Amino acid sequence: MFNPLSVAIGLRYLRAKRRNGFISFISMASILGIALGVTVLITTLAVMSGFQKEIRDRLLQMAAHATVSAQGAPMHDWQHAVALAMTDPRVAGAAPYIESEALLQGERHQPAMMRGIVPNQEDKVSVLAQKLKVGSIDSLKPGEYNILLGKELALWLGVDVGDSVIVLLSQTQTTPVGTMPRMKRFTVSGLFEVGYNEIDRGLAVVNMEDMQKVMRMDGVTGVRLKLHDMDHAWDVARDLAVRLNGPYLVSDWTRENANLYSSLKMEKTVMGILLSLIIAMGAFNLVSSQVMLVTDKQADIAILRTLGLSPAGVMRVFMVQGSLIGIIGTLSGVIGGVVLTWNLERILKLIESTFNITLLPEDVYYITGLPTDMQFPDVVVITLMALVMSFIATLYPAWRAARIQPAEALRYE
């Protein structure tokens, strides 16, 4: 254990002026290196978490938390499925849907996901009505064959509200000239913008009854669910499938977008590993400064040994002194990281206004600010990692100090 004498001497060495000013400089560089590494790591991981949260929130504005769909055939009794889902207190809303891959033709062609909805039930599972820039969800009336397009999709197709688009579905039909894809001309009645390119450029929405007629389908693809807690999506969907007592397929938002979330998680992990090298550099500087301090304090060590301080006691002195440098650097970095994260948006705006530049163009990143989401577990892990690195960095110099023989050290004094 660290006895009071070791702590007292370690604190004295931390505050005392060195005969060699370079040692003081290296010690200060160690503190700054550790503090900088911790600050940058906390801020970067907060930004990465913020981007993950922003993407997830924008994606789930239009995507269901969970889906239950029929296996190999349409779901016919969807009214019963919706009613049964709403009896679960974990479910906030449920609505039927039809989905099919389609090719949309305007001035140009673009593949997209075609989704058939019930307009007066869609607000239970998505915010489509709030994301419409032009038009209304009420324009999707049965038999009128109107269509809502993502803003980017409409721009690519070269169409606007009032224009027509031809929809070719993946299902085929037999005609006198052979097998042809099912097609229908729809009128663009609205444009929506979620702020997520995969949706704004890859989704088209029509009335469910219109889509049933085009596809010659008397049922639906399945039921979409919105939950009070999206983390329970899989359990809720699975329970509903069991209660429906049929061959149903269950999916949730984590499985539908597994590649996206795994890549975001990997990016955060890799970024954390790379930036932790800054802390490692600070710890390496700590080793250098401690080794030079041991050399500078050889006479003091010899006197302490002569007065009865054991080699283990000498080792503890320098471990305390080095660990305190690590603690100061780590705590400074944590404070700096928290303050920087909280004020990052203001700093970004200040830089943009000062230099008259746009760091995050909205047309490229679909955001005007820098989202941050500081996670307490991330801060704890970074803090512990910095403290452990600092402690490990003190071991070798302290061990060297403990090996110094008093007679050898005092011979040249």
From Swiss-Prot:
It comes from Xylella fastidiosa (strain 9a5c). Keywords: Cell inner membrane, Cell membrane, Membrane, Transmembrane, Transmembrane helix, Transport. The keyword Transport applies. This is Lipoprotein-releasing system transmembrane protein LolC. One of its GO terms (biological process) is lipoprotein localization to outer membrane. Its main location: membrane. It comes from the Bacteria. The chain crosses the membrane at residues 22-42, 269-289, 322-342, 379-399.
